[in-house]
Curated annotation (Swiss-Prot):
[4Fe-4S] cluster 2 binds at residues 81, 85, 88. Pfam families: LIAS_N (PF16881), Radical_SAM (PF04055). Binds 2 [4Fe-4S] clusters per subunit. One cluster is coordinated with 3 cysteines and an exchangeable S-adenosyl-L-methionine. Signal peptide: none annotated. Pathway: Protein modification; protein lipoylation via endogenous pathway; protein N(6)-(lipoyl)lysine from octanoyl-[acyl-carrier-protein]: step 2/2. It comes from Saccharopolyspora erythraea (strain ATCC 11635 / DSM 40517 / JCM 4748 / NBRC 13426 / NCIMB 8594 / NRRL 2338). This is Lipoyl synthase. InterPro entries: Aldolase_TIM, Elp3/MiaA/NifB-like_rSAM, LIAS_N, Lipoyl_synth, rSAM. Gene3D superfamilies: Aldolase class I.
């Protein structure tokens, strides 16, 4: 393998990664396709209207559950990221010009799909003077304006912890402000060279101080130890993280970081217990859990824990329900 799919020459790291064959998944890495009525209706609507979601385009295994709950995820900022993380499927390169109409189109897609809760994520845009802060903030504003009954979770890059850029984003008041740390300090620089562990924690702390519900994610299987996961959870909680999701790393291609270990459901259950003991109001852990999985319900848990009443238009999120990809659910089958 000498070139990436987008035609650029492979980085030395990618050449080294590609020398390790793609790993065979263990038996517990699987999902069941349960196509309920809400999913079927949404699937047909998305096809008819030509809408685009991360759920479909990334082949997310949880699409059946999330769409049944009328939840979906959108990617903004284009398909080229200015940073490269060794686990991420998104290409690294020179992004296209900023599309100022994108926030409106995303809001219209949310409306057309009748979503109850939407997650918006995007690429890092270090090529822009504001790092893309306006784009992220405006997308939240447009969704809220056109869909006052829909919750918005905003998953952001770190914006280099720039106070002005963070203020722009925080001022859009998403229901949840997410910034994913993804891995533990010892291997952080190797996995996420353009980010800094302490800077990511700082972003979360600032969001919490601004009164936002905060969220982060850890990906296991990239070389960390269970003990290091516990320490990272402690760091995240002390930084002010309300919601934590924990998942198994699945290698997107040979040029990405090899899978170092397959984490059994039993270990995910242990990490859930640890996170709950540390005081996280919302916890979801399992091999196929993703950061936007059951996002609305986790938001409802966090607001209840903080004594914040759920807005009437989002009261449905407090309803109890199962989560098929949660580790405890896998073990009970």
């Amino acid at each position: 393998m000498t070139a990436a799919p987008e035609g650029r020459k492979l980085l030395r790291l990618e050449v080294r990664n590609s020398q390790t064959p793609i790993e065979k998944k263990p038996s517990w890495i699987k999902t069941r396709a349960r196509m309920g009525p809400e999913y079927q209706e949404l699937k047909g609507l998305v096809k008819r209207e030509g809408l685009h979601t991360v759920c479909e385009e990334a082949g997310c295994p949880n699409i059946f559950e999330c769409w049944e709950d009328r939840e979906a995820t959108f990617l903004i900022g284009g398909d080229q990221c200015t940073r490269r993380c060794d686990f991420c499927q998104i290409d690294t390169g020179k992004p296209a010009e900023l599309d100022v109409e994108e926030p409106r189109r995303v809001a219209e897609s949310v409306q057309a799909m009748g979503l109850r809760y939407s997650t918006v994520t995007g690429v890092a845009r270090d090529d822009l003077e504001d790092g893309g802060a306006w784009l992220y903030a405006e997308t939240v504003r447009q969704i809220h304006q056109l869909n006052p009954g829909t919750g918005v979770e905003l998953l952001i890059p770190d914006f280099n912890a720039d106070p002005g850029q963070l203020a722009e984003v925080f001022g859009s008041r998403p229901e949840v402000l997410a910034h994913n740390v993804e891995t533990v300090p010892r291997i952080f620089k190797r996995i996420r060279p353009a980010f800094r562990y302490e800077r990511s924690l700082e972003v979360i702390t600032r969001a919490r101080e601004d009164g936002l519900v905060t969220k982060s994610n850890l990906i296991l299987g990239m070389g960390e130890t269970p003990e290091e996961v516990t320490e990272a959870l402690r760091d995240l909680r002390e930084a002010g993280t309300d919601i934590i999701t924990i998942t198994q790393y699945l290698r997107p291609s040979p040029r990405h970081h090899p899978v170092e270990r397959w984490v059994k459901p039993e270990e995910f259950v242990e990490h859930t217990r640890t996170a709950e003991e540390l005081g996280f109001p919302g916890v979801m852990a399992g091999p196929l859990v993703r950061s936007s999985y059951r996002a609305g319900r986790l938001y409802a848990k966090a607001t209840e824990h903080r004594g914040m009443p759920l807005p009437d238009n989002l009261a449905h999120l407090a309803k109890a329900g199962t989560a098929a990809q949660e580790a405890s659910s896998l073990l009970s089958r």
